[in-house]
Structures are given as structure tokens and as C-alpha cells.
Amino acid sequence: MKKSARRQSRELATQGLYQWLLSNAAPGEIDAQLRGALGYDKADKELLDAILHGVIREHATLIEALTPSLDRPVDQLSPVERAVLLIATFELTHHVETPYRVIINEAVELAKTFGGSDGYKYVNGVLDKLAAKLRPAETQARRNG
């Protein structure tokens, strides 16, 4: 199945954030490497830039928003789980035009693609809790169906 430009952007953002979390490389250096990555030409570059640079810029604020929904300290998350959760937290707070279920589903798919065997289940559970806090009206409306 062909990936959407938005999915491709999220995958590249995950790779870039993974690199940043492990090496603390400069955002410009990560940009340069991503431009040479497979699938870059098919990505929504505006979304990729918004996510990658937004998460790096707002890292501390995003961690603060995410932490109450975690069952362990942030530094005990795998780098992939942390990158995926940061992307989803950023999108939940900054891309309100995107339904929260879409954001969670995308994050679960990223965790399946890049993470450990059951990491996606953890990501799903954390984001369900987080979405209820960050988007209470939207999540309540869905639950009331």
C-alpha cells in the first residue's frame, strides 16, 4: 500500500528525532541527512519541518505534558517510543485540525514500524490517556458516540 505524504513525513520525523535524542545533533544536520533519506521526495515537507523543529524547540514543554500519562520516567522509554510520543503530543497540541484518533493511529503505526514488538500497545495506552487530557471535548464526544 502506498504511504501518504503525511505518513512519510511522520516516519522521517521519527527517524530525525531518534537521531536527535541519541546524539543531540544540530537540527540543520538532521535536516541535511533527512533530505537524502529514502522517501524524502514523497514527504509533506511542511509537515515534516513543523513536527521535527517543533518537537525539538518545545521538547521540555512536550515532556511536561506527556509525563503525567506515563507509568515510568521519560528516560526509561526507548528512544523510538519517546520520539513517537513526542510527535503525537506535538500534533495533539498544535494540529487541532487533525482528529485525535488519526494522531493516535499514526503513532501506533510508527511504533509498529520502528519500535519493539509490543511498544505500540504502550504508545496507544499513553496517548489514549493524554488525548483525554489535551482534547477532552473531542474524546468525550467520541466516547458518547
From Swiss-Prot:
Any Gene Ontology CC annotation: cytosol
Assigned keywords, A-Z: RNA-binding, Transcription, Transcription antitermination, Transcription regulation
GO biological-process terms attached to the record: DNA-templated transcription termination; transcription antitermination
Gene Ontology molecular function terms on file: RNA binding
Family: Belongs to the NusB family.
Known function: Involved in transcription antitermination. Required for transcription of ribosomal RNA (rRNA) genes. Binds specifically to the boxA antiterminator sequence of the ribosomal RNA (rrn) operons.
Protein name in the entry: Transcription antitermination protein NusB
Species the sequence originates in: Burkholderia ambifaria (strain MC40-6)
Gene: nusB
